[in-house]
């Protein structure tokens, strides 16, 4: 056992200030966020204990300086919450004597959280420094009060020893200084300092909260004092956050860092200063020697020192019930004779004295209050180094006196119900004290010291325990009545203590609390059930240090959420649906054993929620049966904002709790297994990792990750109140999103019995997923899984807009869906399984077999070698360039086999080598159906032998269904100079070019003739072999390995190269002749349509001749259809011009209706919507959606009318290959119409401007101006109410030229001048129910011809032709006139040479004066 000299260790840290006999850390710099000073004082935000190099920025975001560069951040837990004192001994604080207004102190966290169980320590004696005595040479404004209990929440701070203040100016030995206080709060500005005036902003009164920072620099020293001076607006040697004292800071502590001892020490307490400027402060140095010699020694008069050699002393303790007691030591004599006794008198609680009394303070006017009764009790020190026994004869109240033990002791009562009451128990290192006595009800036993308190009395103890250090073992035994309770309430505080259970019934679990900074609850292999765990902060820790027994923690949640109406001081936490535990489960110290511990969440109802926001490190399982279980990080704690609304707005911070969504603490959770047997488990935001295997079952569900820019349920616990809230939050702020890490889910996930798991957003699963029994798994919203998915028995997995790095295996009616994602790994599907791809792409890594496959606008890439550059040109892989078939797994061609049904629509992407007739393949059953596109990337080399490249084959030689359709992307595959088409031959699909195949056939015939010559010179066996090969359908031009045959082939190849060279240097006419000669021979294996060959040949001619179009124009019949040859850029240019002109025609169509209609409206508006599809031989089909709005006015004349129409048209056009175009047209038109009897004659003129823009980012708007004029005539036949009106008209259009560039393609459109002809007839019938109402249905047929307009548009250097065609319009409408209002509506159908069958509707409203 370690022997230590009796000198109590005391540790405290705090800062405070006094002003000229008054309590004055209240001045801070307005240019720095006030929250820095608040967080500094409470060890929150950046200023956590031990932090270093803390950067401080001003309100403009500029770096002011760095705090704590030479020392770790101090622990301010030793400072009283009112800021006027600091803990320097087990029950002693230090301050200034003129602070007479405080009679108690408390320690710990701020806030109203009832789980903290804040304890009030009463001052029983002031211990004012008696300066008038000769032996006391220092100022009398100093005291070190004694408290009635040992303080458990904090460890006392060490004190400086030198009373010569100048030694502390040495910044080498003392590089850091800080202070803290709760005086009046002022904000000081640069201008205040420059003009030497009081600080501008008085923001708070004294004693409401703490602020802290570094001190000013030392400017002088006196007799037991030091003086510091400076200003708060400028950083100094100690840091960027200097603070100055104000009224209310008297007694607040100043701390200094001892570089040699590497620890913070309390240096002084603030006495004087400049209360309105925050400049100089005067401090009283700490008087350590006086404390030990004249304070602690007086309060610990009874000292039983250790004996050498150790003895087993027996002590008897009895109260005389008059404020004194007798302590008798019986020990054997050294010579072994009769035992000897030592008797001592000790002071106890003295009820005969006053409860409170006043003590005159000479350092300041007034009196101090103290408690004579309590103070009368003194400490007892027992230093027996054997195994001592202390027997308490009767109930003892030791007042403010406590028991110190050095060595092993047994403390027992004469009877089981004997009680002891006092300041507490302190046990030295390596010592164990067996505690067999009770403490009275409502009394708290304070346990300090690093030794062990073994509580093993009998019966039911009604007192409570606060464990602040060392270990407490609860091993209470049952009395004769079977009652057993170690304590009614057990508190674990300061983070230094461990409470160990030796049975489950030592204390009611719901009466265990983790106070300020918590500590360890060691279950020691036993199990507890909590309604909720009372906890204050992340210092709470529940562990199992037992090496053999498993322990369980069960949490049930609050049974009732309705608080009783007849009860006062309701603890809302006991009636809340949502509860939280902010501490740890499982040991985190690697030097301590982490035994097996299981956590079970078993709420009574489904609407209960448990938030775990601390962490777990379990060798055991986490099990949930119902309710909601959240795993989450937590907001970084910040000091509470006590400022009122005005000051808070100036600082730009919310009132009350400071929670910034971008400033959270990440948490980790670890368990062997997560068993989710019911309810919902949620792994929420700021969980950096969660480790363990998951099993989700019985309709339960689990969700991992949060999704940016979507609503997420986030749960947080208030540090201030302890209450937990869960709310829906939309994570849209970029700063917040960037602060949330991607949750690493390390482990496998198993789903059974209709379970559901969702992994989405900021989450990554590193493990496999197994699903059975109708369970569902979803990976979505950019989440990632690295691992395999295995599905069976009707399970369903979906990957939607996410990344899966692993294989998928399906059995027994399972289903897998890939949506909005790209997948690079293997999928294998057994019988009755289905794979569905929706807006997805899948790249196969190797051969794949599936049962059923459904594509919905998706792409399957059969080979990773397939890729395309931005301009759709193939990007070649070396493996496909080789002249031999690739053999390695990386470079081979792949086969996709679908044994069941292929359905839907999508794209299959292949790699191929026509040179070697090798490619990826698709093998299908005769159940396959649907429409698909094949995209083939070829090496670019032309074939040199005659074979067939089959891409799609049937299984078991069964023909494929006619319901199965494949279309080649771009209708061709380029290979060398030719384009290959997709043909269906004997139920299979292959690439085919008749010209090339005929050419190769001719080469093969010549090769066969050469072989026959060689065969005559060879033995019969060789000849037979060569003959057999020649008959094969897939025979190569080179078929013999013999030297003579190979030599002949070399000669043939050389000749072929020579012929190719000649062909390339010949004129186009020679090329055409060669192609025609190739067509004259028959291709016996694959018959083909000669007309198709003609078209294909002509197309080749057109492609070769395009650069010479201007010089050698050819008619349309020779060229084929232009739209099949032009690029998307050319097509978009022609489509854009067509769409612009058609918008102008739409305006004229409305004017044509106006001329035919005899409406007399003076003012009208017209709205027309239509959707049209245009197509021609010049450009590919496009769709135009137009919204036309018109306002018109007209004036009636004697024999006619005149008027004007303003038109505005907006069009959304979709050209081929989904090229988007947006266009507007604005026109102003005027018209006049004259009537001779039934004959009408009219004229019109118009001018307008169009603006059009392609959707590509680099394109600019295309502007065109246009004018038109025209004439029209009509004749009206009237047969009663029936009217028949034929009409005709012509309009001349002038459209200016426009040159522009789109994606580096130059487009030139010439100026246009053309006529638009129209003719038609209208039939109507008029009903007149009353004089003021008429109704007129009508039928209208109109024919428009613009075929005379031929345009030549130049794209780069190629001239393209374009016309505008003709079209019919049929319209049915109804016109009604009520009083002066006119309303008409119509439905029309249109169709023409370039216009498909279309419908449009219109509404017109007019008014006539």
Curated annotation (Swiss-Prot):
This is Adhesion and penetration protein autotransporter. Coiled coil: none annotated. The active site is at residue 250. It is an enzyme of class 3 (hydrolase). The signal peptide, cleaved at the inner membrane, guides the autotransporter protein to the periplasmic space. Then, insertion of the C-terminal translocator domain in the outer membrane forms a hydrophilic pore for the translocation of the passenger domain to the bacterial cell surface, with subsequent cleavage. It comes from the Bacteria. Probable protease; promotes adherence and invasion by directly binding to a host cell structure. Residues 1057-1067 have a biased composition (Polar residues). NCBIfam families: autotrans_barl. It comes from Haemophilus influenzae (strain ATCC 51907 / DSM 11121 / KW20 / Rd). Its EC number is 3.4.21.-. Residues 866-888, 1016-1078 are annotated as: Disordered.
């Amino acid at each position: 056992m370690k022997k230590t000299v009796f000198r109590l260790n005391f540790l405290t840290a705090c800062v405070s200030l006094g002003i000229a006999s008054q309590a004055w850390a209240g001045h801070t710099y307005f240019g720095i966020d006030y929250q820095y000073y608040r967080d500094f004082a409470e060890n929150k935000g950046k200023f956590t204990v031990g932090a270093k190099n803390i950067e401080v920025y001003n309100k403009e975001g500029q770096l002011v300086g760095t705090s704590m560069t030479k020392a770790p951040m101090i622990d301010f837990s030793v400072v009283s919450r009112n800021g006027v004192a600091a803990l320097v001994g087990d029950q002693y604080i230090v301050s200034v004597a003129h602070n007479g207004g405080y009679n108690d102190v408390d320690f710990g966290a701020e806030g109203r959280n009832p789980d903290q169980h804040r304890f009030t320590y009463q001052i029983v004696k002031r211990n004012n420094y008696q300066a008038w005595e000769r032996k006391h040479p220092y100022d009398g404004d100093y005291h070190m009060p004694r408290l009635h209990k040992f303080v458990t929440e904090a460890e006392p701070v060490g004190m400086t020893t030198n009373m010569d203040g100048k030694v502390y100016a040495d910044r080498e030995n003392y590089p850091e200084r800080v202070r803290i206080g709760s005086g009046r709060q002022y904000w000081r500005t640069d201008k205040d300092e420059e003009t030497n005036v009081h600080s501008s902003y008085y923001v708070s009164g004294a004693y409401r909260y703490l602020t802290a920072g570094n001190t000013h620099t030392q400017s002088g020293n006196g007799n037991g004092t030091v003086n510091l001076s400076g200003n708060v607006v400028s950083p100094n040697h100690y840091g960027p956050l200097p603070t100055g004292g104000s009224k209310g800071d008297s007694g607040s502590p100043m701390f200094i860092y001892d570089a040699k001892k590497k620890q913070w020490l309390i240096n002084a307490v603030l006495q004087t200063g400049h209360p309105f400027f925050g400049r100089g402060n005067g401090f009283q140095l700490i008087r350590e020697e006086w404390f030990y010699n004249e304070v602690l020694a007086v309060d610990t008069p009874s000292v039983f020192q250790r004996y050498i050699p150790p003895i087993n002393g027996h002590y008897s303790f009895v109260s005389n019930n008059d404020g004194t007691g007798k302590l008798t030591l019986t020990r054997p004599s050294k010579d072994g004779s009769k035992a000897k006794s030592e008797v001592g008198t000790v002071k106890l609680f003295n009820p005969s004295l006053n409860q409170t009394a006043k003590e005159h303070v000479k350092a300041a006017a007034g009196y101090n209050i103290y408690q004579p009764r309590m103070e009368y009790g003194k400490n007892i020190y027992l230093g027996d180094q054997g195994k001592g026994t202390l027997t308490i004869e009767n109930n003892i109240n030791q007042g403010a006196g406590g028991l110190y033990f050095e060595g092993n002791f047994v403390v027992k009562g004469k009877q089981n119900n004997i009680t002891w009451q006092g300041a507490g128990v302190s046990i030295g290192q390596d010592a164990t004290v067996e505690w067999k006595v009770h403490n009275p009800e409502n009394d708290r036993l304070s346990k300090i010291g690093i030794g062990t308190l073994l509580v093993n009395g009998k019966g039911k103890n009604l007192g409570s325990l606060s464990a602040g250090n060392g270990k407490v073992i609860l091993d209470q035994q049952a009395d004769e009545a079977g009652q057993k309770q170690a304590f009614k309430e057990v508190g674990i505080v300061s983070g230094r203590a461990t409470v160990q259970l030796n049975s489950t019934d030592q204390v009611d679990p719901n009466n265990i609390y983790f106070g300020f900074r918590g500590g360890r609850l060691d279950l020691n292999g036993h199990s507890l059930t909590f309604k909720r765990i009372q906890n204050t902060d992340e210092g709470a820790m529940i562990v199992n240090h037992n090496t053999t027994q498993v322990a369980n923690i069960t949490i049930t949640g609050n049974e009732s959420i309705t608080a009783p109406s007849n009860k006062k001081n309701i603890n809302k936490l006991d009636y809340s649906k949502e509860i939280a535990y902010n501490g740890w489960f499982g040991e985190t110290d690697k030097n301590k054993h982490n035994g097996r511990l299981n956590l079970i969440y078993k709420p009574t109802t489904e609407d209960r929620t448990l938030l775990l926001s601390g962490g777990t490190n379990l060798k055991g399982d986490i099990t949930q049966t119902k309710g909601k279980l959240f795993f989450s990080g937590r907001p970084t704690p910040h000091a509470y904002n006590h400022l009122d609304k005005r000051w808070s707005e100036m600082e730009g911070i919310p009132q009350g709790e400071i929670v910034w969504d971008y400033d959270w603490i990440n948490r980790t959770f670890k368990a062997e297994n997560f068993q989710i047997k019911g309810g919902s488990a949620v792994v929420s935001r700021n969980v950096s990792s969660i480790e363990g295997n998951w099993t989700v079952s019985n309709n339960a569900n689990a969700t991992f990750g949060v999704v940016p820019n979507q609503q997420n349920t986030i749960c947080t616990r208030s540090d201030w109140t302890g209450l937990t809230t869960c709310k829906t939050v939309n994570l849209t702020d970029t700063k917040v999103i960037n602060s949330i890490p991607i949750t690493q889910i390390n482990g496998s996930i198993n789903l059974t019995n209709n379970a559901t798991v969702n992994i989405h957003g900021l989450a990554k699963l590193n493990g496999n997923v197994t699903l059975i029994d109708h369970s569902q798994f979803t990976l979505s919203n950019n989440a990632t899984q690295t691992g395999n998915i295995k599905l069976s028995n009707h399970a369903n997995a979906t990957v939607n807009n996410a990344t899966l790095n692993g294989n998928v295996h399906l059995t027994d009616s399972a289903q897998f869906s890939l949506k909005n994602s790209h997948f690079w790994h293997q999928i294998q599907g057994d019988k009755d399984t289905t794979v569905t791809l929706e807006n997805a792409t899948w790249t196969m890594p190797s051969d794949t077999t599936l049962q059923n496959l459904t594509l919905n606008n998706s792409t399957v890439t059969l080979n990773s070698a397939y890729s395309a550059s931005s301009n759709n040109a193939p990007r070649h892989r070396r493996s496909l360039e080789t002249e031999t078939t690739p053999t390695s797994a990386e470079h081979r061609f792949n086969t996709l086999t679908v044994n069941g049904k292929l359905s839907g629509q999508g794209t299959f992407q292949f790699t191929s080598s026509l040179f070697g007739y090798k490619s990826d393949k698709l093998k299908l059953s005769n159940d396959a159906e649907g429409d698909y596109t094949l995209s083939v990337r070829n090496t670019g080399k032309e074939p040199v032998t005659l074979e067939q490249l089959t891409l799609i084959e049937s299984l078991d030689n069964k023909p494929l269904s006619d319901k199965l359709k494949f279309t080649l992307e771009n209708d061709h595959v380029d290979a060398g100079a030719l384009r290959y088409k997709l043909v269906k031959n004997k139920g299979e699909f292959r690439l085919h070019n008749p010209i090339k195949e005929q050419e190769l056939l001719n080469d093969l015939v010549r090769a066969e003739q050469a072989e026959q010559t060689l065969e005559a010179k060879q033995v019969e066996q060789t000849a037979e072999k060569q003959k057999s090969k020649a008959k094969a359908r897939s025979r190569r031009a080179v078929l013999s390995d013999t030297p003579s045959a190979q030599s002949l082939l070399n000669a043939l190849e050389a000749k072929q190269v020579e012929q190719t060279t000649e062909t390339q240097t010949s004129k186009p006419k020679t090329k055409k002749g060669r192609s025609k000669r190739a067509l004259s021979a028959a291709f016996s294996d694959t018959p083909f349509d000669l007309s198709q060959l003609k078209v294909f040949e002509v197309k080749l001619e057109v492609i070769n001749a395009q650069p010479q179009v201007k010089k050698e124009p050819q008619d349309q019949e020779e060229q084929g259809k232009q739209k099949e040859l032009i690029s998307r850029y050319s097509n978009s240019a022609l489509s854009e011009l067509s769409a612009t002109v058609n918008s102008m025609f739409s305006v004229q169509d409305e004017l044509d209706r106006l001329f035919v209609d005899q409406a007399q409206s003076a003012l009208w508006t017209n709205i027309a919507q239509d959707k049209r599809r245009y197509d021609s031989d010049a450009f590919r089909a496009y769709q135009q959606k137009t919204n036309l709005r018109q306002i018109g006015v007209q004036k009636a004349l004697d024999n006619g009318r005149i008027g004007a129409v303003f038109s505005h048209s907006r069009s959304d056009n979709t050209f081929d290959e989904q090229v988007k175009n947006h266009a507007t047209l604005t026109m102003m038109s005027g018209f006049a119409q004259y009537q001779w009897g039934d004959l009408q004659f009219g004229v019109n003129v118009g001018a307008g401007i169009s603006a059009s823009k392609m959707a590509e980012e680099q394109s600019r708007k295309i502007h065109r101006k246009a004018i038109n004029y025209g004439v029209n005539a009509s004749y009206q036949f009237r047969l009663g109410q029936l009217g028949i009106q034929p009409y005709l008209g012509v309009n001349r259009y002038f459209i200016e030229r426009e040159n522009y560039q789109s994606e580096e393609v130059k487009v030139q459109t010439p100026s246009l001048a053309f006529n638009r002809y129209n003719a038609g007839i209208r039939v109507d019938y008029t009903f007149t129910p009353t004089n003021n109402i008429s109704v007129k249905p009508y039928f209208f047929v109109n024919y428009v011809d613009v075929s005379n307009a031929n345009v030549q548009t130049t794209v780069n250097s190629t001239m393209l032709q374009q016309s505008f065609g003709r079209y019919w319009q049929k319209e049915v409408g109804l016109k009604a006139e009520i009083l002066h209002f006119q309303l008409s509506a119509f439905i029309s159908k249109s169709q023409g040479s370039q216009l498909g069958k279309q419908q449009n509707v219109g509404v017109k409203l007019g008014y006539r004066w």
